[in-house]
UniProtKB/Swiss-Prot annotation:
This is Dihydroorotate dehydrogenase (quinone). It comes from Citrobacter koseri (strain ATCC BAA-895 / CDC 4225-83 / SGSC4696). The active site is at S175 (nucleophile). InterPro entries: Aldolase_TIM, DHO_dehydrogenase, Dihydroorotate_DH_1_2, Dihydroorotate_DH_2, Dihydroorotate_DH_cat, Dihydroorotate_DH_CS. It holds the Pfam family DHO_dh. Gene3D superfamilies: Aldolase class I (3.20.20.70). The keyword Iron does not apply. Substrate binds at K66, N111, R112, M113, G114, F115, N172, N177, N246, T247. Pathway: Pyrimidine metabolism; UMP biosynthesis via de novo pathway; orotate from (S)-dihydroorotate (quinone route): step 1/1.
Amino acid sequence: MYYPFVRKALFQLDPERAHEFTFQQLRRVTGTPLEALVRQKVPAKPVSCMGLTFKNPLGLAAGLDKDGECIDALGAMGFGSIEIGTVTPRPQPGNDKPRLFRLVDAEGLINRMGFNNLGVDNLVENVKKAHFDGILGINIGKNKDTPVENGKDDYLICMEKIYAYAGYIAINISSPNTPGLRTLQYGEALDDLLTAIKNKQNDLQTIHHKYVPIAVKIAPDLSEDELIQVADSLVRHNIDGVIATNTTLDRSLVQGMKNCDETGGLSGRPLQLKSTEIIRRLSQELKEQLPIIGVGGIDSVIAAREKMAAGATLVQIYSGFIFKGPQLIKEIVTHI
């Protein structure tokens, strides 16, 4: 299709500039008749997960549309779900640029964005304007200047503001680009956070008369013992789902490539096997007590099928979407 030509032009630009340019164009069409320019017909393949019905099993992973600016245009491409964010209570600029790097030969990306976003209030206003008929997930995190020991307060603030508008809420405790954030995945810190989140979910369910499921997004770099502990905590706290995985700090598959030594999280094809193995082990530990949303290096129908064979109920794409374009959505939904 036309995307290889578009990609060639975009890849002449700095990665973040290419992202900004693309979103400028998408903002122009989102919510207008011009959405027809990006619309794709995909078959209906409903899937039940977390008490919700997804019109197909393919979602857009968090990080692409951090502020929910282009929900309708992205939805027109055929996604069954879109996860916007990560959003924080207050706006923040993120880390210094450059902070996004391509590993073209490996079809991977390294980012150290640092939760750059315009804040939760801005995101909510964008969500109110959207008409996406799929499931909208909202991914939340903590502000960089919030001490880790107070981090749960940021998640609770975001939950309160987005609850009425979210199909599900994703708790991001696994980005490698916010200092100390990944420590919330372990032991007492995780139990304390999940207790607070479940209590808040119960309170908000009473206020809004609807139940919004909670999914926790985990890292691919967990040790075996850490993975077992995380799985146990998710089950004990009745969390509704788990998103596996975020980006990796491992560089073993990209040694010697341009940009391989940049600090940040690695995504795309080099993450594919590692994330699939985490899904497989999680599935064994969870024993179908809660569903897994599989993400990490999905760039083909085969890769999507591998995630589902490992135990994922739903799958998400991000880097594969950058490298392969909207056609990947149609291919996966049609043939998965």
